[in-house]
Amino acid sequence: MSNKDLLGRRNFIKGMGAAAGVAMAAPALAVSENANGVKWDKEVEVLIIGSGFAGLAAAIEATRKGAKDVHIFEKMSYFGGNSAINGGLFAAPDTPMQKQEGVKDSVDTMVADQLAAGRGIADEALLRHVAEHAVEALQMTLDAGSEYHPYLQQLGGHSVARTYQTTVSCGAGITQPLLQECRKLGVHTHNRAKFDGFILDEKGGVVGVKMREGYYFDKPESGKLVRIKARRGVIMATGGFAQNINMRMAQDPTLTAEVGCTNAPGATGEGMFEMFRLGAVPVHLAHIQSGPWASPDEGGFGYVSNYSIYNFPHSIAIDRLTGKRFMNEIADRKTRADAELNCRDAQGNPLPPILITSYEDSKQHPNTKKVLKYNVGWKFDSIDALAKHFDVPLAPLKKQIAEYNDYVKTQSDPQFGKNMTEAKGKFIQAPFTVVRLWPKVHYCQGGVQINTNAEVKDSLTGKPISGLYAAGEVCGGIHGVSRLGSCSIPECMVMGMTAARIMMQA
C-alpha cells in the first residue's frame, strides 16, 4: 500500500509565510447576548471559528457529510493560524509506513505512551478516540495533497517510530492543501473576521455569533460588528493562549514575557475565555508545555526545533558545566524541558546545554543546512575544537562520548535508559554538528472540557452546551500533564472531523 493511500482508496502546495483567568486576559473580551429580538445580518449552515488543523478538517468533513453552506472565520490576515508554523509532525498507529519499516504498533500502544506522559490525569477516552481515527485524518491530508518524508521518526516519549513529517518540515504542508481543498469543496473562508461573542436562545444554547468584519490584529476595537445565525451550530477551533502573557503568568508566574514562545501572535485565547463565560468547564489550565528542542539563538520555533526533533534519537545532550549527559534525549517533553532548565553555571545562571550529532547523520535532515547557514548551529572537525568553543571540560566529554558509543554498539543505555533502536549504527564521531538548547513555551494543555463527540460540557449540569462544539488546543484535559510531540495534529483533525459529523447528525 502506498504512502498516498492509507485506507485503501485513492502536490504539495507551497507553504506560506478559568473564569478568574478571563479577567486577566490581555485581548478585548467578547460578550454574549440573547437571540430575542436580534436582527441577523446573515445566516449560515455550519459556522467554524479558526482556520488551523481543527477548523479546516471540520469544514471538509462537514461538506463530505452533506453541508452546503460552510463558513470558516479567521481573525488574522492569513489562514492557518498557529497550525501553519508548527513542525508538521503527525503521529498515527499501525500505518503502512510502519509495516514497511517493520515497526509494530497499535492504538493501545500509542494510547499507553500518551497516558504515561500525562502522568495519571490524561483523558483516556479522548486519547483512544483520536488514536482510532488518526489514520483517517492522515488520509485526509494525503488526499488534499500533503507530502511527507519517506521515513518515520521516533519522537520523545513514543515507544516506537510512528511520526510522519511534511517535506517542508512545517504545518503549512498540511494547512495549505487543506485550505485549497476547502475552497474546491465550496467552503467560504473569511479572514480579518474576529469572534466577538455568542448569541444564545432562551435555554442558553448557542444559535449564532457576533463577529467583527474588517478586523486588524494590532487594532483591538477595529471592524464592523455583524450577527450571524448558525443553523446547525458553532465549532470553536480557536487554539491556545501561549501568546497571552497575562493568562499564562496567572497559571505559572515564571512564564514571563522574557520566556520565548514558538506560537503565532494570534494564540491569545479569546474563544476559550468566552466559552468559560458561557459555563464551559475549565480543565488543566496550569499545564503549559515548553518545547525542549528549541534554541535560545533564534526567535520562535525557528530551524533548530525540527533539526533537534529529528536528531535527538542519535545524539547526546551535554551539560556544558560537567561535559556529561544529563537526560534521556528521547524522554517526554516535560522531562527534557525540566532537565534543561536545571543546566546552570557555577553562579546559578542559565547555561544552555548543547546537542552533539555526527554530521553524517544530521545532514539527512534538510534543516541542517539552514541551522549552519543562519549561524544557529555549528560544525566542528574535532571534539577538541567543539569543547573549546563551548567551554566544556574536555576529558569528561571525551569519556562520555566513548561511553555513549558503547551504548550504540550494545543497544542499551544504562545511564538514562534511552531506547537505542533509532541510534543503531549511528555513532557520535567527527565531524560534528552542534546546537544549543533552551525550552520555549509551546503548547497549552488546558482549555474547555469536551466529550468524545467534541461537545463542550456545561460546568453546572455536566451536559453538552447545545449548539457548541470545540476541537484542537482550545480544548483541555486530553493530554494531561504533558503532550507527546506529533500528537497535536491528529487530535486537532480528528476532533474537528468528529465535531462536524456529530453536528451533521443532530
From Swiss-Prot:
The active site is at R333. Optimum pH is 7.5. GO terms for molecular function: FMN binding; oxidoreductase activity. Residues 1-30 form the signal peptide. The keyword Flavoprotein applies. GO terms for cellular component: periplasmic space. The keyword Cell membrane does not apply. Induction: Part of the ard operon, which is induced under anaerobic conditions. Expression is further induced by acrylate and methacrylate. Not induced under aerobic conditions. FAD binds at A54, E74, N82, G87, G88, E473, I489. Its main location: periplasm. The ArdAB flavocytochrome c is composed of a FAD-containing subunit (ArdA) and a heme c-containing subunit (ArdB). This is Acrylate reductase flavoprotein subunit.
